[in-house]
Design a protein with these regions (language model features):
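Central antiparallel beta-sheet cores of small beta-barrel/beta-sandwich binding domains
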Residues: 35-100, 107-108
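Short polar/acidic secondary-structure junctions
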Residues: 31-33, 102, 113, 127-128
Length: 141
C-alpha cells in the first residue's frame, strides 16, 4: 500500500512539473496589434531550449521566406524555422540564447519565463534586458 501511495505521488508530481514547463506549443501574439500570428513549438534538445514555427496563422504570409535572416536561415521558409536557439535554465528563467525576428531578420538575446502554466513571457533584447521588448505567448492544448 505504501508503494502504491508513493507511486501515485510521483505520477502527480511529474504531471505537475510537466504543466510548469516551457516545452509545448504556444500561440504567439503580435505585441503591436494584439493579433495571433503563429504557433511555435518549444522543445528541449541536449539540455537546451529551442523553438520552431509550426504554423503561420495568416494565409497571406504562411509560405513566406526569411529573406533578411542571417547565415543558414537566409531565404528559408518561416514555417519550420527555428526562432529560439540555445536557451539554458537559470532558476525560473531560460536565457543565454537567441531569438530571431523573422520579420526583420535580426537576432536578439532572449529570456523566457512562465507567468502561469499557460502564459509564457518572451523577452528579446540587445545588450541588457532593459533595452528590448516583451511578448506574451499562450499555451495551445
Amino acid at each position: 500500500m505504501k508503494q502504491l501511495i508513493t507511486l501515485l505521488f510521483c505520477i502527480t508530481a511529474m504531471n505537475s512539473m510537466q504543466s510548469q514547463s516551457v516545452v509545448g506549443k504556444w500561440k504567439t501574439i503580435d505585441d503591436a496589434t494584439g493579433e495571433a500570428k503563429s504557433i511555435v513549438e518549444v522543445f528541449s534538445k541536449s539540455g537546451k531550449i529551442y523553438a520552431k514555427v509550426v504554423d503561420v496563422l495568416d494565409p497571406a504570409v504562411k509560405y513566406n521566406l526569411c529573406k533578411q535572416c542571417p547565415g543558414d536561415d537566409k531565404n528559408k521558409p518561416i514555417l519550420g524555422l527555428n526562432i529560439i536557439k540555445g536557451l539554458s535554465k537559470d532558476g525560473a528563467e531560460y536565457n543565454s540564447g537567441e531569438i530571431l525576428d523573422p520579420k526583420n531578420g535580426k537576432l536578439y538575446k532572449c529570456a523566457l519565463s512562465l507567468e502561469s502554466k499557460d502564459k509564457l513571457k518572451v523577452r528579446g533584447y540587445i545588450g541588457f534586458s532593459l533595452i528590448g521588448r516583451t511578448q506574451y505567448w499562450y499555451r495551445v492544448n
